[in-house]
């Protein structure tokens, strides 16, 4: 727990080489006056390698003989890893654009494909007997270590997505705006369950009020628009290579035979779910935006509500069992988003001042079944349960500190531990006259009530200087170290 170990002895013990190449090409064909066909290809390739050296670390400890303790196994070691990842996307889009009278229309149809592949291989060895590996980057290769101590690991996956989409934008008189979209996505992540495909929709509308005749005489108002939208989105991402088909792990062993012996074994890394499917988000928002004083002042406000259904999440294992993955429930997030910005130009000088604020109220609507909870955290302090914020802190409410033995005698009996003056005084939440595990309750929420930001900028000709500040408030932090047990 000595932070100076990391600062003094572990600094500069890793060497990395990272390379990345990305690019895109496209071809466009305009035909029949109102049609356009566009094909786009993009690729992103990354290659990352690292070598990490483990030194022998000794620290002072007055509680042991000689006052010196060697951390770890007392041996130097080297770890090497190599990772490559490729991402390839292709888009095929056909667009129709036309205007007649006071109407304008843009319609798009097409398809997209996305492919992602990752491979990683790593290995580690410690020093040979009596042969310390030098703290020299030129020597940080696993071939210098003892082959008998070799360990290795690997990680790999392939994933692809195919989508078909359509979108329509309609404008009447330059003031009434409508849009609608549809897409059908298929993901290889759910190919094992047969739930690869899912449909998603969205609609939206806007009214540019400032273009109406009854607002033309308001000289200080440059633009005023009311807007609203509703739509559905999908999520297939989980921290698993193949969410519907678990990989095998060799982190387990078993005892067989007479006489018994320990044999290495393989086990599913998590329980498969034959019904696993897309996570879906249904969202709507309504708001307004406006420009004032020759477009120098911009103000925008939106109320939003998002409901996540068929939530993709992992259920922790219990009593040595492996975890499970499933579509566990639904979550609601709602709040407001506000933004204001002032921008002006004075000769060669320009400046801008802006601020934004977002509020959020989070609640779990349902979770597997009534009364079910997901427990996580170093000390099982994070709970997720229907009717509460996601990941809320669960524990005992503190009413104060015991001052005297007399106060302890008059207080509800603490059955958790023997208390003395100076100990924390817990609240008897259920009122049964005792402090028990049944008195645990919600004591905090890790999700901030509000996030905010401030932007300052100044420019002179081709020179710019900007400052961005951000923060959050209304959330609690659970300190898992140096706390009451």
For each feature predicted by the language model, list its residue ranges.
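Exposed, low-structure sequence patches enriched in small/polar residues
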Residues: 40, 110, 167-169, 226, ...
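Extracellular/periplasmic, surface-exposed regions of secreted and cell-surface proteins
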Residues: 1-54, 65-388, 471
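C-terminal beta-signal and adjacent terminal beta-strands/loops
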Residues: 219, 361-363, 391, 403, ...
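Acidic carboxylate motifs that coordinate Ca2+ or other divalent cations, activating on Asp/Glu
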Residues: 432
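Conserved SET/PR-domain catalytic core that frames the SAM/AdoMet-binding pocket
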Residues: 438, 448-462
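Conserved active-site-proximal loop/helix segments of enzymes involved in bacterial cell-wall
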Residues: 312-317, 365, 435, 479, ...
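Glycine-centered loop/turn motifs
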Residues: 379-391, 414-424
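Extracytoplasmic gating/loop element in the C-terminal half of outer-membrane beta-barrel translocons
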Residues: 60-62, 187, 415-421, 472-485
């Amino acid at each position: 727990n000595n932070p100076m170990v990391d600062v003094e002895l572990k600094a500069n013990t890793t060497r990395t080489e990272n390379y990345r190449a990305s690019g895109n090409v496209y071809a466009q064909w305009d035909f029949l006056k109102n049609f356009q066909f566009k094909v786009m290809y993009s690729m992103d390739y990354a290659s990352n390698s690292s070598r990490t050296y483990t030194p022998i670390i000794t620290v002072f400890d007055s509680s042991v003989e000689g006052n010196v303790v060697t951390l770890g196994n007392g041996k130097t070691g080297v770890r090497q890893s190599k990772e490559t990842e490729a991402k390839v996307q292709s888009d095929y889009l056909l667009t129709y654009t036309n205007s007649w009278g006071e109407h304008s229309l843009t319609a798009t149809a097409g398809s997209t494909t996305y492919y992602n592949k990752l491979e990683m291989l790593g290995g580690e060895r410690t020093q040979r007997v009596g042969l310390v590996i030098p703290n020299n980057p030129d020597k940080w290769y696993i071939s210098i270590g003892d082959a008998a101590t070799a360990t290795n690991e690997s990680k790999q996956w392939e994933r692809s997505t195919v989508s078909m989409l359509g979108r329509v934008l309609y404008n009447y008189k330059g003031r009434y705006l409508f849009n609608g979209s549809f897409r059908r996505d298929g993901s290889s992540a759910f190919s094992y369950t047969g739930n690869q495909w899912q449909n998603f929709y969205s609609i939206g509308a806007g009214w540019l009020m400032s273009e109406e005749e009854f607002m033309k005489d308001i000289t200080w108002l440059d633009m005023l628009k009311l807007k609203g939208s509703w739509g559905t989105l999908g999520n297939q991402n989980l921290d698993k290579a193949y969410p519907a088909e678990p990989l095998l792990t060799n982190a387990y062993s078993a005892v067989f035979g007479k006489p018994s012996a320990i044999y290495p074994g393989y086990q599913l890394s998590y329980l498969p779910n034959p019904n696993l499917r897309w996570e879906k988000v249904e969202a709507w928002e309504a708001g307004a935006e406006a420009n004032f004083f020759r477009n120098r002042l911009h103000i925008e406000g939106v109320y939003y509500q998002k409901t996540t259904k068929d939530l993709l999440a992992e259920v922790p294992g219990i009593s040595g069992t492996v975890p499970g993955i499933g579509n566990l429930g639904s979550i609601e997030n709602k709040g407001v988003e506000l933004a204001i910005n002032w921008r002006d130009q004075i000769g060669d000088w320009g400046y801008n001042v802006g601020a934004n604020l977002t509020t959020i109220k989070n609640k779990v609507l349902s979770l597997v079944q009534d009364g079910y909870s997901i427990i996580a955290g170093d000390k099982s302090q994070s709970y997720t349960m229907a009717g509460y914020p996601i990941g809320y802190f669960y524990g005992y409410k503190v009413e104060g500190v015991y001052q005297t033995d007399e106060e302890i005698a008059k207080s509800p009996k603490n059955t958790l531990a023997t208390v003395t003056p100076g100990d924390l005084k817990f609240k008897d939440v259920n009122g049964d006259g005792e402090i028990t595990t049944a008195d645990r309750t919600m004591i905090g929420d890790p999700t901030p009530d509000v996030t905010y930001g401030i932007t300052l900028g100044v420019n002179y000709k081709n020179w710019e200087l900007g400052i961005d500040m951000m923060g959050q408030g209304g959330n609690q932090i659970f300190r898992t170290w140096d706390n009451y047990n």
